[in-house]
Amino acid sequence: MIRFVDANLGRWLRHLLFVLIRSYYALFFNVSCSGKHLLQDQPGTLILATHVSRHDGPLIAALLYSTKRIRPTVHYHEYYNWSQFLPMFIASAIPMSSPKSWPDEKRKARKAVVLKIVHKVLAKGNSVLLFPAGKVRREEREKVPAYLSGVHDILRAEPETPVMLLRLDGLGKFQDAAYDSFWTFLGIKKGRRHVAMDLRPLRDLDPSMAVEAFNARLEDLLNEPISHEL
């Protein structure tokens, strides 16, 4: 029954939600996105993104919605927060973690279930948005702790999975802020904040590496600055 509702009513609600979100962000952010067209011809892609602010998930999902169906991953507690049920349901979000209070065996079983869902989504040709750092950046450099093995586990199980790196600039607390003149007709000098989104294929991640070395390499890639050279 849930699948039937999602396939019919959910499709319309999803489209309406993302149109509203995209319109909202267009009022406050002037976003440029490079490489978005590459995603359209690459089904079943794992998108690894920097996590610079709480706006990342909805902004990315809304901007890429018309290009490819994106299933965002979210924290367990965020997913099961009753106040966020509707957007989580409409966006078909995937809860990636589990409460630390759970026994180890229960957490391992939960992780296996989540990884199975991710692989099923990718096999259907949909893309999965994942933030390797696991939380919003609280310092200038993106950190990918060695104990977060989700990306490593996904690619080790399916090494041929297409991977794309998504970096955001201008949106986070520790990034430079620049504004356009969108609101000057109202006498407001500070307009929309300029945000750069860069999406490119990633072919040099080796899942055969130990998870510590793998995460260190991924961390370096996430922290590479976006080139704005013409």
Question: Could you tell me what each predicted segment is?
Answer:
Residues 138-212:
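A cross-family acyltransferase "interaction/gating" segment
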Residues 3, 7-29, 84, 88-92:
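Short hydrophobic helices that act as membrane-entry/anchoring signals
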Residues 44-46, 125-131, 162-164:
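Residue-level preference for the first positions of well-ordered beta-strands
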Residues 76-79, 134, 167-172:
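Short beta-alpha junction loops
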Residues 41-107:
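Catalytic core of membrane glycerolipid acyltransferases/transacylases, capturing the structured
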Residues 106-114:
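Glycine-rich anion/phosphate-binding loops
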Residues 21-53:
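Helix-to-loop junction immediately C-terminal to a conserved catalytic motif
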Residues 52-53, 133-136:
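Short glycine-rich anion-binding loops that position phosphate/pyrophosphate groups of nucleotides
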